[in-house]
C-alpha cells in the first residue's frame, strides 16, 4: 500500500516537473507545510518528491531552527537534505550530532567537508566569538555554502574552496550528478550514486592547517568527507597530537577498521552518537547514525553531559 501511494504521488509530481516554470511554482506551494506541526508525515512527502527528477529551480531561502534557540535562513534544493528547510520548522538533520554539540564551547573550529554550510552556520550562531574555518572542495556545494553564510551574516566563518589530503596540490574530485552532497575524492564511493562529474580541486595538507591552530585554545575538528576520514586524520596527525582537539567524525563503509588502525586515536575515548544519547565504544563500527564524537582521555570529565 505504501509503495502504491509513493508511486501515485510520484506520478502526480512528474507533471509539474516537466518544465522549470511549473516545477518552481509547484514546489513553492509546499512552503505552506511550514505552518503545520513537524512530524514523520513531512518526511513521507519529501520521499515522494525525491522519486522525481526535477529541473534545476531556484527556491527562496527559508528560516528554520537548526538547534534549540538557534534559527537561520537556508536556501533549499529539492532532492538535497537542505530541502527540509522548505517544509520543516525545525530541521530534522542529524539530531544526535546537534545534541552532542549543544552544551559545548570552542574557540577554534575546523570543519572539513562543510558542504552547503549547515554546521558552519550553526557554529557561527552558537559560538559568535569562535573562529570557524570551513573547507569544501565541491564547486556547487561551496557556492551554496557562501550563499548561506551571507544570508546569516556569519562573519566569524572563513571558507576555503579546497580539499584536505596527505599532500598539498591538486586532486580529482568526483561529484555525483544527482547527489551533489555526496561528492568525494573516492571515485568508487561517488559512483555508487550514479554517473559523476570529475573536476580538479586544490588540496591542503595537515601542515598548512596547523597554522590555523591557536595553541591552548579549545578546538573542535569535524570531518565529513565521504570515506576519506582516515586519510585526513593521518594528514592531521601532528596537529591532533599537539592540540588534542575534540573531534566529530562520520564513519561509513570500510572506514571503521581503517580508523581502528590509527594508533594516535587510541588516546581518545569514542562515543557513538545515537538517537537515545551518546554511547561509549571501544572501537569504531558502522552504525545507522554513522557519527562518532572523540574526546581526549585527559579531558574526559565533561564528555557526557
Which residues make up each language-model segment?
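S-adenosyl-L-methionine
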Residues: 1-135, 143-148, 155, 213-215, ...
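Mobile, glycine- and charge-enriched loop segments
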Residues: 50-52, 57-58, 67-69, 73, ...
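Short internal loop-to-helix segment that lines adenine-nucleotide cofactor pockets
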Residues: 86-110, 170-172, 186-243, 254-257
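Conserved acidic-Pro-Pro-aromatic motif
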Residues: 106, 127-134, 209-305
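Short N-terminal helix/helix-N-cap motif within the alpha/beta-hydrolase-1
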Residues: 118-121, 143, 169, 230-234
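Short aromatic-enriched loop/helix-cap "lid" or pocket-rim segments at secondary-structure transitions
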Residues: 170-174, 185-186, 261, 282-285
